[in-house]
Amino acid sequence: MRSGRLHIALIAALAIYATLLIGTGTSAAAQEMLLHSFRPYGSPPCCFHARTADGFDPFYSNLTIDTAGNLYGTTTAGGIFGYGTVFKLTHTASGWTEAVIYAFGHNLADGGVPEGGLTLDAAGNLYGTTHGGGANNSGVVFELVNNGDGTWAEKVLYSFNNTDGYGPWAAPIFDAAGNLYGTTESGGAYNYGTAYELTPTGGGNWSEQVLHSFGNGTDGATPFAGLVMDASGNLYGTTWLGGANLCDGAGCGTVFKLSPTGGGNWSEQVIHNFINNGVDGNEPWAGSLIFDSSGNLYGTTTLGGTYLCEGGSVGCGTVYEMTPTAGGNWTEQVIYSFNGGGPGGEDPTSAVLFDAAGNLYGTTYFGGLLEGGTAFKLTLRDGRWTEQVLHPFGASGDGVTPASGLIFDRAGNLYGTTMEGGLYDGGTAYEITP
């Protein structure tokens, strides 16, 4: 991300609900409601809630929903030890209540500073990563076991040691055999990150294998985002930097494919090199790719595209589509470029999400009518994608800087988090109702 833009001026918090509505399309606007305002240490109206505080700063934490409609996520800071939390939001007759179900940093061997979201298994257990902590202070993959009585127990499945990866951001994903796959932003053979596999070996133990070390030539570097898997077991992801083309002295980023080649080995193929050419996006940040029903991939880039931001120096970000072609190749098409001069937002840092009708939903980190970011919907009409702003963040008491993406519940409501803002400037969890 560009330095100097990670924190924007916040409007003083006065109310818990933000209902300012806007739509750039013709359909009815959506309504946003805050479910929880996270509270940093020392927030008003009281003094210091030292080491008993709520978590705060839910960074790139996409929420996860269980079959009962409960929501789960992470905060990078706060909790009784100060190194972040895992939280649960429960819907009751009187509204939503938040509970911290795990606080990191008891001895830092358990991990610290979870940057991303969580993966839920069929038994109701949660899996995630922390950027730091662990036995080697290089981050961990962890499991939170639901004890069934309202309590949770944490187990570190693997502690990275820098040579096999450092600083995982995104939650790992499962394959059908119960193996976990993910990325680390740095470390590995060339210190530009890794893709890894964790395999259960019995007795609650796991072994790790580095599938690929990034940074050797033009294969990409710094994979913040997680992985997705196709029906054949191939993995797909993005790197923030690296690749064949330069942006501001560093690579513009890539989309890559990892394929198993037998004997436990994997090969990497760069299927797209982003380029700063006034059309293509560049620097895909922390949003994982998604598939449509035809096998096409969709993602976002934080920069690039047709319209210029930052005084005309760089693009405002894009949503793009990757389509497989003959011979194992792929073609990329920008389907939407954000215009920082309008209400549509800029700098999307997270993944997009499909609904049943084929519309795409996501967030922008900055921009919008109130300059606090947006939640948006993209609709395909007559071969062209058009944007509707579902909610502009930044009103008094509302959240700002929605770094994470969105999820649906069964009723079609959307849920997400903002990194900042809310009643206590510690970020929010919110619901958007169509």
What are these regions (language model features)?
Residues 2-434:
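Extracellular beta-propeller repeat domains
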